[in-house]
């Protein structure tokens, strides 16, 4: 698994669904990766020193956007859509387990979608920006 993760031609993805952390809404036990795929990848990269952090971030952002033909996503440059996750590289980790899958990851400070803050200090702002992405 670690060898495959290290291949720069392979991006990271998940078939997990978008569930709420609110157990009154999420009345099922989703797979733990629905809440932790990307933090888990970053944790494994850090712990096993698989690649530089910027390469790991590219495998989560720029490479999938390129593969999907999303030319205005996945990279920070003028004219691109500002979808940004600010995280502590030493603290980021997945916390979900099969026995308790609805758990927030640690180490994520801010999330911006389309330039709008949707997560601040690990807490949702209630912003509902974003939408379905289509190849252009």
Regions found by a protein language model. Give the residues of each.
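His/Asp/Glu-enriched, well-ordered alpha-helical/loop segment
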Residues: 3-89
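Long, low-complexity intrinsically disordered regions
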Residues: 128-136
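C-terminal cap of metal-dependent C-N hydrolases
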Residues: 2-9, 14-15, 85-129
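Glycine-rich loops and low-complexity Gly/Arg-rich segments
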Residues: 36-39, 109-113, 135-136
């Amino acid at each position: 698994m670690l060898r495959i993760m290290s291949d720069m031609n392979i991006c990271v993805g998940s078939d997990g669904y978008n569930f709420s952390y609110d157990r009154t809404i999420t009345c099922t036990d989703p797979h733990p990766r629905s809440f932790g795929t990307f933090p888990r990848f970053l944790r494994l990269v850090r712990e096993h020193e698989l690649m530089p952090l910027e390469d790991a971030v590219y495998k989560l952002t720029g490479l999938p956007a390129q593969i999907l033909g999303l030319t205005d996503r996945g990279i920070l440059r003028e004219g691109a859509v500002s979808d940004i996750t600010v995280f502590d590289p030493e603290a980021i980790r997945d916390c979900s387990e099969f026995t308790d899958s609805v758990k927030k990851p640690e180490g994520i400070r801010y999330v911006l979608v389309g330039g709008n803050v949707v997560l601040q200090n690990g807490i949702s702002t209630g912003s509902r920006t974003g939408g379905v992405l289509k190849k252009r």
